[in-house]
């Protein structure tokens, strides 16, 4: 869709520049994700004591939760270089070979969207991950032979929003697998206050809490809303982002009290009004909302499920009683919806 979406967790070009400015360098300065940080701190300390590279790491979860930032921190804590690429950027085996042969001992290679690697490239990656070796096929047909090149020991960090899309052989080659969770309002409030100090944005605690409440548990969304509200406060208020200023600005941007925007409403209303609340298939929802099925599944559904507005069932997606109540629509019982009340709360 062409409509600007303030609450999407996907990175925009303008996000990258700000995120570089706000990015912490140490695990101790990284807010939230306490379980992930505790595990990583142990694994990093142990690897450094042994004088070895860190085991390969797989980070998965919705977009905007800090997977790239963690890759930067891991490289910094290990005292090594970081090389960044993405699954779609490695289109041929030669591309991967060029990247791997340029790594130094202990370096970190971060592959974003690793689920989008093509199969041939992925298979070339297996011996590199397991044996730190690269198999190159010379010649064709019966005369073809394989030349094995030794690689420096390195750490591969893969990031994905679609854990289930990874093949089992690839998943099994990661020694460390960590899932990133949505952030609490308290954690997002701390993130916003820190960002405001760095960016010199006048933000009071009430304004920070209001932004955090509507940021869908996602730091990237919170920081993006902070920047847009800075503009709103400078033009429509005295420059300070208070709770009232944040509320007015977010309403102007179409972000409601639960952090939902017009796209979220369209998804829910499509299920309710066009398909009787469900169950309805993913492709059908995508066609009705003019969105890609992968976008519905990766961007919209995780948050709608987290707050209890949407359920996945064997027969399709179902809008919950909580969604009906929030949208002020009379509820009709659905046999596919799990029994028991679902509260519209993030945490």
Curated annotation (Swiss-Prot):
- Report the protein's function: The RuvA-RuvB-RuvC complex processes Holliday junction (HJ) DNA during genetic recombination and DNA repair, while the RuvA-RuvB complex plays an important role in the rescue of blocked DNA replication forks via replication fork reversal (RFR). RuvA specifically binds to HJ cruciform DNA, conferring on it an open structure. The RuvB hexamer acts as an ATP-dependent pump, pulling dsDNA into and through the RuvAB complex. RuvB forms 2 homohexamers on either side of HJ DNA bound by 1 or 2 RuvA tetramers; 4 subunits per hexamer contact DNA at a time.
One function term, GO molecular function aspect? ATP binding
Question: Where are the annotated segments for Large ATPase domain (RuvB-L)?
Answer: 1-183
According to UniProt, the reaction catalysed is: ATP + H2O = ADP + phosphate + H(+)
Q: What is the lineage of its organism?
A: Bacteria, Bacillati, Bacillota, Clostridia, Eubacteriales
Keyword DNA repair found:
yes
The source organism is Symbiobacterium thermophilum (strain DSM 24528 / JCM 14929 / IAM 14863 / T)
Which InterPro entries does the protein's record reference?
AAA+_ATPase (IPR003593), AAA_lid_4 (IPR041445), DNA_helicase_Holl-junc_RuvB (IPR004605), P-loop_NTPase (IPR027417), RuvB-like_N (IPR008824), RuvB_C (IPR008823), WH-like_DNA-bd_sf (IPR036388), WH_DNA-bd_sf (IPR036390)
Q: How does it assemble?
A: Homohexamer. Forms an RuvA(8)-RuvB(12)-Holliday junction (HJ) complex. HJ DNA is sandwiched between 2 RuvA tetramers; dsDNA enters through RuvA and exits via RuvB. An RuvB hexamer assembles on each DNA strand where it exits the tetramer. Each RuvB hexamer is contacted by two RuvA subunits (via domain III) on 2 adjacent RuvB subunits; this complex drives branch migration. In the full resolvosome a probable DNA-RuvA(4)-RuvB(12)-RuvC(2) complex forms which resolves the HJ.
Set out the biological process GO terms recorded for this chain's protein: DNA recombination; DNA repair
What is said about the domains?
Has 3 domains, the large (RuvB-L) and small ATPase (RuvB-S) domains and the C-terminal head (RuvB-H) domain. The head domain binds DNA, while the ATPase domains jointly bind ATP, ADP or are empty depending on the state of the subunit in the translocation cycle. During a single DNA translocation step the structure of each domain remains the same, but their relative positions change.
Q: Which UniProt keywords apply?
A: ATP-binding, Cytoplasm, DNA damage, DNA recombination, DNA repair, DNA-binding, Hydrolase, Nucleotide-binding
Per its record, how is this protein called by name?
Holliday junction branch migration complex subunit RuvB
What are the binding positions for ATP in this chain?
Answer: 22-23, 64, 67-69, 130-132, 173, 183, 220
Q: Which residues bind DNA?
A: 312, 317
Which residues of the sequence carry a binding annotation for Mg(2+)?
Answer: 68
What is the annotated localization of this protein?
A: Cytoplasm
Q: What is its EC number?
A: 3.6.4.-
Q: Which GO terms describe its cellular component?
A: cytoplasm; Holliday junction resolvase complex
Q: Where is this region: Head domain (RuvB-H)?
A: 257-347
Region Small ATPAse domain (RuvB-S), as annotated, extends over 184-254
Just give the chief location class.
cytoplasm
- One matching Pfam family: AAA_lid_4
């Amino acid at each position: 869709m062409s409509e600007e979406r303030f609450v999407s967790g996907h990175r925009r070009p303008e996000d990258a520049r700000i995120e570089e400015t706000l990015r912490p360098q140490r695990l101790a300065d990284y807010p939230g994700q306490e379980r992930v940080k505790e595990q990583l701190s142990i694994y990093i300390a142990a690897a450094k004591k042994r004088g070895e590279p860190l085991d390969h790491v797989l980070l998965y979860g919705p977009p905007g939760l800090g997977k790239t930032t963690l890759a930067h921190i891991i490289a910094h804590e290990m005292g090594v270089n970081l090389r960044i690429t993405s699954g779609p950027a490695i289109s041929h085996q030669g591309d991967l070979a060029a990247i791997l042969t340029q790594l130094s001992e202990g370096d970190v290679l971060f592959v974003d969207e690793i689920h989008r690697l093509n199969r041939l490239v992925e298979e070339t990656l297996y011996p590199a991950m397991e044996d730190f070796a690269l198999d190159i096929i010379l010649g064709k047909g019966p005369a073809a032979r394989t030349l094995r090149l030794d690689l420096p020991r390195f750490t591969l960090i893969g990031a994905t929003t679609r854990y289930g899309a990874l093949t089992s052989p690839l998943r099994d080659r990661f020694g460390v697998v960590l899932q990133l969770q949505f952030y609490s309002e308290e954690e997002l409030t701390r993130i916003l206050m820190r960002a405001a100090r760095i960016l010199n944005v006048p933000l009071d605690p009430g304004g920070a809490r209001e932004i955090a409440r509507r940021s869908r548990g996602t730091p990237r969304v919170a920081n993006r809303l902070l920047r847009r509200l800075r503009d709103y406060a400078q033009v429509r208020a005295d420059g300070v982002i208070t709770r009232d200023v944040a509320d007015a600005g977010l309403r102007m941007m179409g972000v409601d009290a639960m952090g939902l925007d017009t796209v979220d409403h369209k998804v829910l209303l499509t299920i309710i009004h066009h398909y009787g609340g469900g169950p309805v298939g993913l492709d059908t929802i995508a066609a009705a909302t003019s969105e890609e099925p992968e976008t519905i599944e990766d961007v919209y559904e995780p948050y709608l499920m987290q707050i209890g507005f949407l359920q996945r069932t064997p027969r399709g997606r179902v809008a919950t009683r909580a969604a009906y109540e929030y949208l002020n629509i009379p509820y009709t019982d659905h046999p596919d919806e799990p029994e028991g009340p679902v509260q519209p709360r993030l945490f």
